[in-house]
């Protein structure tokens, strides 16, 4: 059976008081107390984004399944942008070393990992713009206002310590993500 197209879909996202939003040529800028996030939605053909009286309005006509999926993905992106500029995002990584002590340091826009399973070379992971990385003993904290940059930086750090050619059950050395949270919404233990 064929999926019917929706003739008209309109979704609204309320803009909180703490946030300033501007839209120019489908480039959305969200600025809040924790920073600014800019995202280009020019790839979204057939979806109209506009600002009106404290709301972001998204509209589309004759939406099939793909266009609906794109619309609701854009809504999720915008909500993540708003949450990030109000609260921010934080990822926690743990340094695991069973054989050789791993040393981790932040140098400019990269994280340097040395002495991983006794290697002499330094492994490097790129820190994306707007992301702050701090090393506290065996914990690494990655935080920022753009969830995509924070997540990619944490993934860069984790994948830079991937060990190839050894049994992962025995050589479990590396850096691993163990917790993700929205700053300010963390659970009290």
UniProtKB/Swiss-Prot annotation:
One Gene Ontology molecular-function label: structural constituent of ribosome
Sorted UniProt keywords: Ribonucleoprotein, Ribosomal protein, RNA-binding, rRNA-binding
Keyword rRNA-binding found: yes
Classification via InterPro entries: Ribosomal_uL6-like, Ribosomal_uL6-like_a/b-dom_sf, Ribosomal_uL6_a/b-dom, Ribosomal_uL6_arc, Ribosomal_uL6_CS2
GO BP terms: cytoplasmic translation
Keyword Ribosomal protein set for record: yes
GO cellular component, one term: cytosolic large ribosomal subunit
Domain of life according to the entry: Archaea
Function comment: This protein binds to the 23S rRNA, and is important in its secondary structure. It is located near the subunit interface in the base of the L7/L12 stalk, and near the tRNA binding site of the peptidyltransferase center.
Quaternary structure and partners: Part of the 50S ribosomal subunit.
Similarity comment: Belongs to the universal ribosomal protein uL6 family.
Protein name stated in the entry: Large ribosomal subunit protein uL6
């Amino acid at each position: 059976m064929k999926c019917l197209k929706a003739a008209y879909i309109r979704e609204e996202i309320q803009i909180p008081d703490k946030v300033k939003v501007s839209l120019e040529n489908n480039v959305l800028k969200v600025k809040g107390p924790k920073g600014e996030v800019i995202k280009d939605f020019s790839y979204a053909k057939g979806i109209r984004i506009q600002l009106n009286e404290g709301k972001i309005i998204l509209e589309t006509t004759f939406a099939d399944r793909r266009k609906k999926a794109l619309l609701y993905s854009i809504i999720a992106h915008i909500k993540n942008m708003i949450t990030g500029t109000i609260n921010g995002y934080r990822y926690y990584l743990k340094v695991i070393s069973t054989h050789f002590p791993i040393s981790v340091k932040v140098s400019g826009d990269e994280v340097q990992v040395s002495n991983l399973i006794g290697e002499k070379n330094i492994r490097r992971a790129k820190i994306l713009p707007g992301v702050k990385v701090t090393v506290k003993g065996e914990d690494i904290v990655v935080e920022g206002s753009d969830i995509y940059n924070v997540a990619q930086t944490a993934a860069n750090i984790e994948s830079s310590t991937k060990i190839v050619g050894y049994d992962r059950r025995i050589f479990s050395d590396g850096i691993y993500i163990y917790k993700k949270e929205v700053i300010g919404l963390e659970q009290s233990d």
